[in-house]
Regions:
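Metal-dependent polysaccharide deacetylase catalytic core of the NodB/CE4 family, i.e.
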Residues: 25-125, 146-153, 178-188
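Histidine-anchored nucleotide/phosphate-binding helix
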Residues: 18-22
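C-terminal active-site subregion of NodB/CE4 polysaccharide deacetylases
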Residues: 1-17, 93, 97, 104-107, ...
């Protein structure tokens, strides 16, 4: 058996389609959210575009996130997507914990997961986050053996969902028993081919009799 998990950052509008596809294939997913960057009742539909696609990632309205992510795991990505090692350590941790508290209150369940904004972390922030009650911190580094982490606050994934080595990384991960991929749903923008490629990954993984979908938090429990 191989445990497979995925996570998606930032609470953007394209997450709606990710959720739909995950439900279609009974796939689990964790969504890393920034509560402080959402409007209360209106979606954010204007702003910086993703690369040269003309696609605006946007943000879900806060009053819809509970229904959109119903049945899925959520994790802290900080209230305001601050960068560890750039802002004061205590301010960074306070921001991360504030998001944790908001998510726990809003979703009515424990939230001990974290994804490092920009993939940045320091030994000091790892220790402080651990003391603050976080169970793991996802980085943007890759490893062939996710399960053999030395510090769960520096939890590396197997690959990014759009990397050309996706299936090679999956096969390399089989001996370890864990395959973990991540991304941003806006990276698929409105491109049918990219969405089809993602759906094909979900289908192939879900049809593999050796695959068991899990949440990221399950890797460190």
């Amino acid at each position: 058996m191989i445990k497979v998990c995925q996570c998606w950052d930032d609470g953007v509008l394209n997450d709606i389609k990710v959720v739909e596809l995950c439900r279609k294939y009974n796939a689990k997913a964790t969504f890393n959210l920034n509560p402080g960057l959402h409007n209360a009742v209106e979606r954010i539909t204007e702003g910086k575009t993703y690369l040269d696609t003309g696609h605006v990632p946007g943000k879900l309205a806060w009053n819809e996130v509970k229904s959109v992510y119903e049945g899925f795991e959520v994790a802290s990505h900080g209230m305001n997507h601050l960068s560890a090692g750039v802002v004061d350590d205590k301010a960074f941790v306070a921001d991360a914990v504030a998001a944790k508290n908001v998510l726990e209150d809003h979703f009515g369940r424990e939230c001990r997961g974290f994804a490092w904004p920009y993939g940045r972390y320091t030994d000091e922030t790892c220790q402080l986050m651990r003391e603050a009650g976080f169970a793991y911190g996802r980085t943007t580094l890759y490893t062939e053996d996710v399960a053999s982490y030395t510090d769960p606050m520096q939890l590396h994934s197997s690959t990014h969902f759009q990397r050309g080595d996706f299936w090679a990384a999956f096969e390399k991960a089989r001996p370890s028993g864990v395959f973990y991929f991540w991304g941003h749903s806006y990276e698929m923008a409105d491109d049918p081919a990219l969405w089809q490629a993602y759906e094909d990954k979900l289908r192939r993984l879900s049809e593999d009799p050796e695959v068991e979908w899990v949440n990221v938090i399950d890797l460190v429990k």
